[in-house]
């Protein structure tokens, strides 16, 4: 069963009709229901709006919208329930409110130069039966008014811990502070103070500095919804440090020190502040008499073995002192190589031949084979020569034994054959008596 909700004026009329006499009561009720039928109802209509977030000093836009409007009256009220606009009429005398659009389905109003005091709920009302109401919340963002960075000491010494503070004042909501040293993010400790809906944030950073931090920026960067881009401030660190000492040998260029050579060393010292004094000393001994000192340079001419030792360069400034050592060792002078001789050449040639054999194994094998062949041939030749010698000896002995017989045969053909026979007999008798041989061999 549907119920009809009467406006407050209709409810009063109904109460009066109930107190009237019965005949008049019926007439008043009929008149009342007829009047209620002429008032628009909220059936099918929907009033809606959206919240607004705006940065201080900018423009906020408030829109009251109606779906399926039947030309009902729309009005806008401020947080104090004062009417800003009734339809297209502005009862409130605040020129910052301006009508942007008015129709049966929308009432759109702008608020310029928004301040923190404008924050709150704004109400949209639709005059239906029953009336509808919706509200929008305006949130005002306030960026930090001032960003300050404060460093405990303008000039620090390496190894010292310093305090750095960064303050973001009067923001809404509270600001988030981030710390950077160069490109490295660091972690600080923040404290928030609230005053009259505004926030002041102070972040503290404890930083131990080193010589590498000299000239490096310390950056305080804020993050806030009212800030676009990077809002930051920075301070450059100034760090003092003791000297850094390095010894460089400028002569001899090859780096090997020998007797008779010269030595030149240069001491490089870098510090902050710049070292005011650079000195050379010889550790555990006196500096050679022939050594020459000229500022950061040490020059020793005509080196000898007595110059061996450790040479130290010392540098100092107001922060401290440092040193670097150079150990000198003098080598013997280079020996003179004698010119090559015939013997040396022969030895070199022999060595080269051996290396060639070792490098190529096949050449060695062929040489061995050739050596074996020559030995065999030499042996054969020797045997042949020996055989020929033996043959000659045998032939010589043979001819020597048969020499008389040869002459005897030659003599047989002669007239004195008898004498030849006598010679043969004597020859066969041997050679024991040389006189007998002379007697028969005429």
From Swiss-Prot:
Residues 45-374 are extracellular. The modification Phosphoserine is found at residue 434. GO terms for cellular component: basolateral plasma membrane; cell-cell junction; neuron projection; plasma membrane; synapse. The modification Phosphothreonine is found at residue 422. Residues 1-44 form the signal peptide. It is a single-pass type I membrane protein. Belongs to the nectin family. This is Cell adhesion molecule 1. It comes from Homo sapiens (Human).
């Amino acid at each position: 069963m549907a119920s009809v909700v009467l406006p407050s004026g209709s409810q009063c009329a109904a109460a009066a009709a109930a107190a009237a006499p019965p005949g008049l009561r019926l007439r008043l009720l009929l008149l009342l229901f007829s009047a209620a039928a002429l008032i628009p109802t909220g059936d099918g209509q929907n009033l809606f709006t959206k919240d607004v977030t705006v940065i201080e000093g900018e423009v906020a836009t408030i829109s009251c919208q109606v779906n399926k409007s039947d030309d009902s009256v729309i009005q806008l009220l401020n947080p104090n329930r004062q009417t800003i606009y009734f339809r297209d009429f502005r009862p409130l005398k605040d020129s910052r409110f301006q009508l942007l659009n008015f129709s049966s389905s929308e009432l759109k109003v702008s608020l310029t130069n928004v301040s923190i005091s404008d924050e709150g709920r704004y109400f949209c009302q639709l005059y239906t039966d029953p009336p509808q109401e919706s509200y929008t919340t305006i949130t005002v963002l306030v960026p930090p008014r001032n960003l300050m960075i404060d460093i405990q000491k303008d000039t620090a010494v390496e190894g010292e811990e310093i305090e750095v503070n960064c303050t973001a004042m009067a923001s809404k909501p509270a600001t988030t502070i981030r710390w950077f040293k160069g490109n490295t993010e660091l972690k600080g400790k923040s404290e928030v103070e609230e005053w009259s809906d505004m926030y002041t944030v102070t972040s503290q950073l404890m930083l131990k500095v080193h010589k590498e931090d000299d000239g490096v920026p310390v950056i305080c960067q804020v993050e806030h919804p009212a800030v676009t881009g990077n809002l930051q401030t920075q301070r450059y660190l100034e760090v003092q440090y003791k000297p850094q000492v390095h010894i460089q040998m400028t002569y001899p260029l090859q780096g090997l020190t020998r007797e008779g050579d010269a030595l030149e060393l240069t001491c490089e010292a870098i510090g902050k502040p710049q070292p005011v004094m650079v000195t050379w000393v010889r550790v555990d001994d006196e500096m050679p008499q022939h050594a020459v000192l000229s500022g950061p340079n040490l020059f020793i001419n005509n080196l000898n073995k007595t110059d061996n030792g450790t040479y130290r360069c010392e540098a100092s400034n107001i922060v401290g002192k440092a040193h670097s050592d150079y150990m000198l060792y003098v080598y013997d002078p280079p020996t003179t190589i004698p010119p090559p001789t015939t013997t040396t050449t022969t030895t070199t040639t022999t060595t080269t031949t051996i290396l060639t054999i070792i490098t190529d194994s096949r050449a060695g094998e062929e040489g061995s084979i050739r050596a074996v062949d020559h030995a065999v041939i030499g042996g054969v030749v020797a045997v042949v020569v020996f055989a020929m010698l033996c043959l000659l000896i045998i032939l010589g002995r043979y001819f020597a034994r048969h020499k008389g017989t040869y002459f005897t045969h030659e003599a047989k053909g002669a007239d004195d054959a008898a004498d030849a026979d006598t010679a043969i007999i004597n020859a066969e008798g041997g050679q024991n008596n040389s006189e007998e041989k002379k007697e028969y061999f005429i």
